[in-house]
Amino acid sequence: VKIRPAGLLDLARIEEMHRSADIRLSQAEPPAARLWSLLSSTLSAILPLSQETLMYVAEENGKVVGFIQASGQPLGLDLRRATVLQVLNLQVAEESDSEVVAPALVEHLSDQALERGALRLFVRLPERDPLLPAFRLRGFRQYATEVVVYADKPEPRSDRFPDGVRPVKRGDNRMLYQLYRKGTPQGVSQLEAPTYREWRALHGGEWTGRLAARGSDKQEYVVDRVEIVGWVKAERSTGARPDTLNFMALPEGPLPGELADYGLSLLKDSETPAWSSLRHYDSHMIDALRGRGFGVLLTQLLLVKELAIRVPVREKGLVPSFG
């Protein structure tokens, strides 16, 4: 198998493979699950070649039999400055051996990303995806599980809302970062956003698994009790997709349930289904939403490969000089 950069002449074949995979996925997944995958950069997304992406193809006997694509994060970041990349797509033609082609593509992408100065490669994969072994065999490890919950008609349980709830204002970002660090296992936050600056660059995007709001009809609130202990963002749908709820909350007493009810109140009178993307460590919010008509739509695995280990520079000691 020969791996090389994708060129314009490869696009027709790449699009053919992508359409074929699209048809198979559409038959296997509920429509809402497929829509979520398309919106959240789950493995199977594809960007035009002209955008800031790396794309490589696998060739056998002169024919393209697979391709892999990755982008900088946030999406569209100049690749010359990107230290974190996300794998958007990996596909192998049906007639080819995916156990040979897929790992070769993953390995080549890893090598090229490292040469460009990237520190980490991330990928979001549906549970039990047949391509999962290709990543595990090339050094990717799972660091989190993402759970997407969905309700055709969500039902609030109470009109009791959290004490201290108020609209987000300028200056809240640093306190929101502290909330993120408190509610996120250290092993995850150190990978995704070890500094406030990195968190700001990624906050609100698909990188953390929380669907980004794309419309203008969105509302954002925090629960302020000297420190911020909860956050909710509600976006009413402006098209075919469901309404979106995003949450961060400390697992304290009635707070998750009250925050869930408050989030649903922001969508009152909406006839549209709703969904929310949460992590395995957000079990308190998942349970709160389950009690309000939500069910698990799909589970996805978040994997990472460390391309380069950052080692702190040893400080030089000052040695007294005599004489």
Residue ranges with predicted function:
Residues 73-87, 236-246, 297-298:
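A conserved beta-turn-beta hairpin within the catalytic core of GNAT-like acetyltransferases
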Residues 97-111, 137, 253-267:
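Conserved acetyl-CoA-binding loop-helix of GNAT-fold acetyltransferases
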Residues 87-100, 244-256:
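A short, internal acetyl-CoA/4′-phosphopantetheine-binding micro-motif in the GNAT/acyltransferase core
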Residues 55-57, 63-72, 86, 222, ...:
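Conserved beta-strand in the GNAT
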Residues 27-55, 60, 191-218:
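Active-site rim helix/loop that mediates acceptor-substrate recognition in acyltransferases
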Residues 113-126, 269-280:
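Conserved GNAT acetyl-CoA-binding A-motif
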Residues 138-158, 271-323:
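Active-site/acyl-donor-binding loops of N-acyltransferases
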Residues 2-25, 163-191:
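A short beta-loop-alpha structural element at the N-terminal edge
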